[in-house]
Swiss-Prot record:
Family annotation (Gene3D superfamilies): Glutaredoxin (3.40.30.10)
Primary location: host cell
Localization (cell): Host cytoplasm
GO cellular component, one term: host cell cytoplasm
Taxonomy of the source species: Viruses, Varidnaviria, Bamfordvirae, Nucleocytoviricota, Pokkesviricetes
This protein's name: Glutaredoxin-2
Species in which this protein is naturally found: Variola virus (isolate Human/India/Ind3/1967)
Family statement drawn from the similarity comment of this UniProt entry: Belongs to the glutaredoxin family.
Gene (UniProt): OPG088
Protein purpose: Glutaredoxin necessary for virion morphogenesis and virus replication. Functions as a thiol-disulfide transfer protein between membrane-associated OPG128 and substrates OPG095 or OPG053. The complete pathway for formation of disulfide bonds in intracellular virion membrane proteins sequentially involves oxidation of OPG072, OPG128 and OPG088. Exhibit thioltransferase and dehydroascorbate reductase activities in vitro.
Cysteines joined through disulfide linkages: 13-16
Pfam family, one: Glrx-like
Amino acid sequence: MKNVLIIFGKPYCSICENVSEAVEELKSEYDILHVDILSFFLKDGDSSMLGDVKRGTLIGNFAAHLSNYIVSIFKYNPQTKQMAFVDINKSLDFTKTDKSLVNLEILKSEIEKANYGVWPPVTE
């Protein structure tokens, strides 16, 4: 069973689309799940299944810790049910306007370095 990369992006966001396209190149190593963050957090969105308290905590955590990220990536281990935050910002080159804005070698390194169960995310 492969680990999963969960990509939280915004609709109509060209950077998010380019990141998603670049990360697809890792699909031989990971299952990839794309999540529209706005739809996810809508009142009737998928996050509603968590219940009001957990949903509120999740929204608060996103706002407090991930507001500096245009797109967020987590890796998930389905066997242990643990998640890890992946610092994608280190792999992005914002001077590029296509999927080459993601340096896949740096991203792979960040995926491997991401520690399960660490929250809030430690950023350098």
